[in-house]
Amino acid sequence: MRIAFISPFFPLEGGIARFSGLLAAALREQRRDDVVPLAFRALFPPFIAKGAEAPLPDEFRLVLFNPFSWLETIQRLRSLKPDIVLVAFWTGFLAPLFYVVRRFTGIRMVVLLHNLSSHESFFIEPLLQRLLAASADGVLTLSSSVSQEVKAAMPAIPLLQLFHPVYEPEGSLPSVVDARHELHLDSSAPVLLFFGYVRSYKGLETMLRAMPAILLREPLLRLVVAGHFYEDVSFYRRLVDHLGLGGNVDLYPGYVSTERSALYFAAADAAVLPYRSATQSGVVQLAYGHGRPVIVTPVGALPEMVRPGETGWVAGDASPEGLADAVGEFLDSRERLASMRPAIEAFRRDYSWEAFAVSAGKFLETIAAGR
């Protein structure tokens, strides 16, 4: 089956690009599908986009804010004659593009839905969701919370709920001792990692406000924050100073390479996701891929990805107090973290890219056939 896949791909930054690249590879390997990436060159104008630009291959032609590139993509699809178009969707601003592609090619389309509702909603979102519904012949979701939204918003569209596969580490991992030495962390202190893009809904502020209560319990605990800040990092630096956390919080703003991410996870005892809202998060899967448990808030699909006491801990709520209590549970369990590894390994096997590709491929075949 020939699949045209519209999405960001590496070397663009972000979890969507990484997810789509791994899915394309798994579809080729497990099913021998001919997956043709139709890759974005840019998603936002330079004055909005933040972060360093990586050189992109010439075939990365699609520009979300340039309708002329949409027309070129339509022409490419007409030449490719794929059996199905698979599109990655995580923000409403993609809906007009996908609507135009579906209408002017006539090729059936499956939406790989990371999020239906944006984390930071805006007034035209209902209109954009209607455009998406008019474009989709089928929908793939990664969590039950998103599936429920889809069933309510577009009940007539075929839906397959799958899962977010685990990200396996690339290359060898540094030892805990070496990683902590390089990051200037105490070899025996508890270390938590907040990893990935820093945006308001991800709750770093909440985690920082939980830290004073946590430090009353364990004064040596360190919080490592690594990722690209979509907000002013100086706000967080001032908050760290205001709360007296300078000796317990390390901020590493900016793009994190694969090698550097392995260093952070190797140094950490657990990853913390203090999200205020969420659907699912690739950070959980990345932590499991590195053999680390997680501490999450009870929002969106995050609790679905945690087996309490076996692969991590779920806070009672998304408040500083709730997070402090969950970290307390982690501290109580720290001596037996090694015993959690078999459960994390089992999760990795169950949530593999191979299993995802087999199920997704069968669904794509069904939609392509009009069934």
Question: Across the structure, where does each feature detected by a protein language model lie?
Answer:
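Conserved donor-binding/catalytic core segment of Leloir-type glycosyltransferases
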Residues: 186-202, 208-211, 224
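Acidic donor-binding loop of glycosyltransferase active sites
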Residues: 263-279, 292
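Conserved acidic donor-binding segment of nucleotide-sugar-dependent glycosyltransferases
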Residues: 308-309, 313-320, 328-335
